[in-house]
Amino acid sequence: MTVVESGKPTPMKAMKVTKPYAPALPELTPAQELALLARCLFSEGYDDHLAGHITHKQPDGTFLVNPFGLTWDELRASDVMRMDADGNELDGPWTITPAITLHVELHKARHDVGVAIHNHSRWGTIWADIGRAPEVYDQTSALYHGEVAVYDEYWGAVDDPRNAQSAVKAMGDANVALLANHGVLVLAGDIEQAYLRAMSFEWRCRQAWHVAAAGGGTPMNREAARNYGDFFNTHQFTGLFEAMARRELRRDPTILD
């Protein structure tokens, strides 16, 4: 088969929308947003049993966080915990994991981060174990085309502040990181962007593995992938998180309780 180059990629233009894409979600509280994000990401492969934590920065400087002991596919808004900037529990019915230290250090160093996600996702953890970032082979993988940091000095846990600080330093300005022999870390400004980046990166990890298993392939043109990712980083992917949230609410209407 001959692959024909179509010329130099050109930047995408925003679509003009004159009516809604689909039914709107009800007005959500921050805790409801976090619960929906956890459910959506569980469906995408962020599903390692009790592992994983999501922090959602609030205007008053506190953070919402999922509790330890509940899987992401059973989390409801009423389960969501609140902690201060040092990781101390302020409110909620359950317990906050000691491993939240990584998020505490991240938020102290990166004031641009509104949402931080850590889990041992099914496909991302494979590449964390390999110790390198996968190539981008398709458009969905390119929805996040920023830097992927690889932190390869894993000491067995990140609940020690020194280890967490080392991971944050190694990450720099990247918004996605592979923690070698551990898992994935995704940072974003808000809930919708967090879902987009986490979903896209897990998709990328899965597709790259399948392409390699099939004998290899040609990665997406880097400039085209960058244009595509930059566009959706700027304009968001209107309706994406809402559609996936509606899917989860169809499965379990009690998420917002």
PLM feature spans:
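Glycine-rich flexible loops
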Residues: T2-D257
